């Protein structure tokens, strides 16, 4: 039995750089001198020598590899082990972020290059890997089975050496079968999707998508060089093989996941290169008269950036103050600065939400949602007696009822045949400033869906008084003024990103009191 060390000795002792064989086997504290103290006490001084450490795998020499391969030559050749070797990795240069990506770095280029490399691996290295990894862990087992299927069953362009590898492959392939564990089946499916769709050098969708607020775009030839059919094909094959053999609830994919739309390179290129033409609300009313028309016709994306540019141009023109005294011109300039500050408060949120969209599919979905809601609210406005105007979050009018057109003296074509903003109908600058101040309160954060306010709307200066409806006294009093004051209630309809998508404004005119009307 060894002597117990005192606390002072334990504090002053230093660990040996390498223990001897006896101390290593008995788990004793060895010393640096040879023979060590433990071996001298036990009369084993002549046998005291340093223990031989195991060499790391990457330090093994070629002769050592050759000897081990000679000793274990009876093990079958497994090309998948060579494929999963951690020491041989085909180098793929990653391009800079500001360079045009070559098509060889896109899609399944990594998988294609690795499929061509197994016949170039050293056979001794593969046999050594099969020796040391006789009991594979779960992840390696899943990857081996998946890659074995993909590389040797779904590849038609292999050369003669790859065919010989297929002939010598052992009969342990799973074919269309699955693992005995449901958890392994789930991991098999998830890892397969990661491998088949891994694009380490491809840019993210946020970089490749065309944003209206960012001028840095990818070269137009980039999307035309991507073969999207090759990207979708392996996923369909894997899901088709495992679709009928998974009796448990799928956590990664649904049954409809194999029916994903084909991402055609020509469609992507056309949608990103062709600018969106403006379609007036009067035209869209004829195109989408029912819900079936929305799903049968091609939805035309609404260009929100261009609408904001037109709004900015209108505000600058409205508040320019030309041919006005210096004081009034300065007051208009101050009102314009207030409006621009209000727009700048919620503009970053709108930009960040737009950048996360997958263009043009998300834009089409949002426009379909808008047109679908517009049909419902137009039907509701026909059943409601209050005059109604519906406009987008940019302020562009998309619908107006006939009774409000009659009050203001406009025709439907005057407002909906071109881009018309709700601010253009406002009589004074105070109403416009108040509009943006109220819109800011519901644009971001505050999810209140209604606003109650007063507003002045201007009437058509070229209106025909004989076309006005109502009593003679009411028509006369309305015709004498160039604007009408309304009590207005706004209902805000939001999209899937909680941004204001549509504003439904109901306007009740404040009529002048007659002789027999009591004022409270």
Curated annotation (Swiss-Prot):
DNA-binding region, residues: 20-48
Lineage: Eukaryota, Fungi, Dikarya, Ascomycota, Saccharomycotina
Family recorded in the similarity comment: Belongs to the ERT1/acuK family.
Cell location: Nucleus
Family matches, as CDD domains: GAL4
Protein name (record): Glucose starvation modulator protein 1
Gene3D superfamilies linked to this entry: Zn(2)-C6 fungal-type DNA-binding domain
Domain PAS: 376-445
Stored Pfam families: PAS_13, Zn_clus
Record-linked SMART domains: GAL4
Keyword DNA-binding part of the UniProt annotation: yes
Primary location group: nucleus
Gene Ontology molecular function terms on file: DNA-binding transcription factor activity, RNA polymerase II-specific; RNA polymerase II transcription regulatory region sequence-specific DNA binding; zinc ion binding
Protein purpose: Transcription factor which regulates nonfermentable carbon utilization.
InterPro entries: ERT1_acuK_gluconeogen_tf, PAS_13, Zn2-C6_fun-type_DNA-bd_sf, Zn2Cys6_DnaBD
